[in-house]
């Protein structure tokens, strides 16, 4: 009986692992990313970009999601993206930011220059500048 249960569990893991994306880039809180989302309008699909600051990452595996914050027409908008969802077309890293927290909710209270995040330059670019 236990062998049947383990076969069922293994098949569930196989199904989940087949749905995981393998083209995701490595990013964390404080980074600026662009998420391209597929949107269906009628019978057509189009790509909509959402570029902003990562303020939270959570979950693992199929439940991995990220909260991105951007300013749109003077109002800040936060959107949660499940990254292994089929509606996500691509994720692009724009720049790396240096923060000391994994969830940077404090950025919501800051405004102006106080809300800036220090940029980390990749090592290859840093060598080229020097």
From Swiss-Prot:
Biological processes annotated in GO: translation
MF (Gene Ontology): structural constituent of ribosome
Keyword Ribonucleoprotein: yes
Pfam family, one: Ribosomal_L19
Keywords of this entry: Ribonucleoprotein, Ribosomal protein
GO cellular component: cytosolic large ribosomal subunit
Function: This protein is located at the 30S-50S ribosomal subunit interface and may play a role in the structure and function of the aminoacyl-tRNA binding site.
Entry protein name: Large ribosomal subunit protein bL19
Gene: rplS
């Amino acid at each position: 009986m236990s062998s049947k249960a383990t076969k069922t569990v293994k098949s569930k893991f196989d199904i989940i692992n087949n749905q995981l994306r393998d083209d995701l880039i490595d990013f964390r809180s404080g980074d600026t990313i662009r998420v391209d989302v597929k949107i269906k309008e009628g019978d057509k699909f189009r790509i909509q970009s959402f570029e902003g600051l990562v303020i939270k990452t959570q979950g693992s595996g199929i439940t991995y999601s990220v909260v991105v914050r951007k300013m749109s027409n003077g109002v800040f908008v936060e959107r949660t993206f499940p990254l292994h969802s089929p509606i996500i077309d691509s994720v692009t890293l724009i720049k790396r930011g240096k923060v000391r927290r994994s969830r940077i909710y404090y950025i919501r209270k800051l405004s102006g220059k106080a809300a800036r995040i220090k940029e980390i330059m990749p090592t290859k670019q840093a060598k080229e500048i020097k």
